[in-house]
Amino acid sequence: MLRYFRIAGFLFSKEGCYITQNEVNAVFDEQVRLCANTLKRKTKEYTGDDPDRLGAFKAAAALQHTTPQRALAGMLAKHIVSLYDMCFAEEAVYPMDTWDEKITDSLNYLFLLKAIVKEGHTN
């Protein structure tokens, strides 16, 4: 028997289309690994010899006469718009490495935002 459910006006069937909690956990673990590897790889590119890992956001904030949080939010917006466009593209099928790049970069900006917010609360 097919079971249907409705989300935001769309009708979906669960038959043959589900993911287990173990599979979600594996996706999570792989994504965290991708995020960590990317953050490590890009540290030198974005900080040079500056020991402040958040220095690029502070420099961008100074250039834009704003806060590091807002500077980061502007950079994150580009990735979110790209993901949004990918999600709503009618005919396009994107390779997994494109999804990985966009999702990983977006998550890393959120991790860096957390570091900026945390730094602001400790200073």
Which residue stretches match the model-derived regions?
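Targeting/processing segments of secretory and organellar proteins
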Residues: 1-3, 7-8
